[in-house]
């Protein structure tokens, strides 16, 4: 039986992981309240890349301001976030790890006090006081996910992963 964990893994886009160890996206709550990258989050993630992960994924990065799921969440919903993401992607890649950002919208799980408004969902959900999105808002959400992916590409990430679990907007 061969050990494949230490073997490279190539993707069709041309990126290659030096090994098959991947850092899962975790909730760090270390970034600034406006979604910009903090030194703490940068240090935490680049330290993991330095530790030998073949792929290092960021924590969930929200694609709309009203999609924030927790305090200190990294954002990617505005061009003000690009500088920090460029720094982070470069810092991760400097250690030989692929850099991937997780795109996220907390949907009905966005705390009202955190987003200063009512959470949104595919339909009204009384349990979470979430209101259903209008068709126009669905189209805007689609555009915002695409724009976030473009910001990730501009920032130098090797890829994106879309968070679709836990009752979030794309569950």
Write out the residue ranges for each language-model feature:
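Glycine-rich, flexible loop/turn motifs
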Residues: 5, 70-73, 116, 121, ...
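General structural feature for long, well-ordered alpha-helical segments within catalytic domains
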Residues: 81-84, 88, 134-137, 141-144, ...
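Non-globular sequence segments
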Residues: 98, 104-157
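Short beta-strand segments at enzyme active-site cores
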Residues: 56-59, 99-104, 155-169
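Generic hydrophobic/aromatic pocket-lining and core-packing "Φ" positions
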Residues: 45, 89, 149, 157-160
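Aromatic side chains
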Residues: 42-44, 77, 145, 157, ...
């Amino acid at each position: 039986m061969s050990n494949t964990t230490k073997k490279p893994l190539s993707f069709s886009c041309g990126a290659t992981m030096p090994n098959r160890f991947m850092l899962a996206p975790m909730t760090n709550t270390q970034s600034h309240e406006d979604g910009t990258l903090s030194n703490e989050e940068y240090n935490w993630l680049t330290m993991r890349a330095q530790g030998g992960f073949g792929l290092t994924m960021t924590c969930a990065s929200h694609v709309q301001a009203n999609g924030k799921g927790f305090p200190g969440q990294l954002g990617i919903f505005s061009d003000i976030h690009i500088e920090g993401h460029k720094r982070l992607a470069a810092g991760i890649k400097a250690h030989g790890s692929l850099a991937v950002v997780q795109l996220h919208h907390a949907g009905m799980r966005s705390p009202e006090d955190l987003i200063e408004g009512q959470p949104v969902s595919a339909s009204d959900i009384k349990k979470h006081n979430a209101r259903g999105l209008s068709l126009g808002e669905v189209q805007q959400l689609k555009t915002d996910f695409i724009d976030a992916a473009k910001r990730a590409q501009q920032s130098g990430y090797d890829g994106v992963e879309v968070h679709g679990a836990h009752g979030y907007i794309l569950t």
